[in-house]
């Protein structure tokens, strides 16, 4: 009977911790919109989807189907043509998995350098796909600034996500 109560307690604690982590991720995305009236679609706002997908892909394993469906969801939210973000994220994931044989991505410095190239690849490939489809393009300088804000904000987001994730790993299992 005591083991059953402990198991129920652990399962409920795990659900609560996962909920708080999802709420934390949501607040990270929502905070700039409420505080500074900066929309997620704004070009000075960092590409949070790239940060979150890379974070969970590199430190924890995301499979290719979840990345594909996340890309479809991001397409629906951002108004991009269906499949654009999915193609970009799946391509970047394949390149990351093939190249990760040659380096250890758990090291912080290597992880950051790889993220810089990952971010540049995704933003440039997305820009290329948008210009091929003759959609509205505002210029390459905006993509450059968005990549800079994304790269600079990766460290902050990783600091925010790492300490709760360590806590969740310790108590959720």
Curated annotation (Swiss-Prot):
Subcellular location: Cell membrane
Protein's UniProt keywords contain Cell membrane: yes
One annotated Gene Ontology cellular component of this protein: plasma membrane
Segments crossing the lipid bilayer: 13-35, 50-72, 107-129, 139-161
Disulfide feature: none
Annotated keywords: Cell membrane, Membrane, Transmembrane, Transmembrane helix
Record bears the keyword Transmembrane helix: yes
Membrane topology designation: Multi-pass membrane protein
Organism superkingdom: Bacteria
Protein name as catalogued: Uncharacterized protein RP566
Annotated organism of origin: Rickettsia prowazekii (strain Madrid E)
């Amino acid at each position: 009977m005591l083991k059953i109560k402990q198991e129920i307690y652990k399962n409920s604690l795990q659900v609560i911790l996962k909920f708080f982590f999802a709420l934390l991720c949501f607040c990270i995305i929502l905070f700039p919109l409420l505080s500074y009236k900066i929309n997620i679609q704004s070009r000075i706002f960092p590409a949070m989807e790239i940060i979150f997908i890379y974070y969970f892909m590199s430190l924890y394993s995301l499979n290719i189907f979840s990345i594909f469906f996340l890309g479809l969801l991001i397409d629906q939210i951002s108004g991009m043509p269906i499949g654009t973000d999915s193609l970009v994220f799946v391509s970047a994931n394949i390149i990351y998995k093939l190249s990760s044989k040659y380096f250890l991505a758990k090291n912080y410095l290597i992880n950051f350098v790889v993220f810089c190239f990952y971010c540049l690849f995704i933003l440039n490939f997305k820009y290329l796909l948008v210009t091929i489809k003759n959609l509205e393009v505002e210029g390459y300088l905006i993509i450059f600034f968005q990549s800079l804000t994304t790269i600079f904000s990766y460290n902050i987001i990783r600091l925010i996500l790492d300490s709760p994730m360590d806590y969740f790993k310790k108590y959720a299992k």
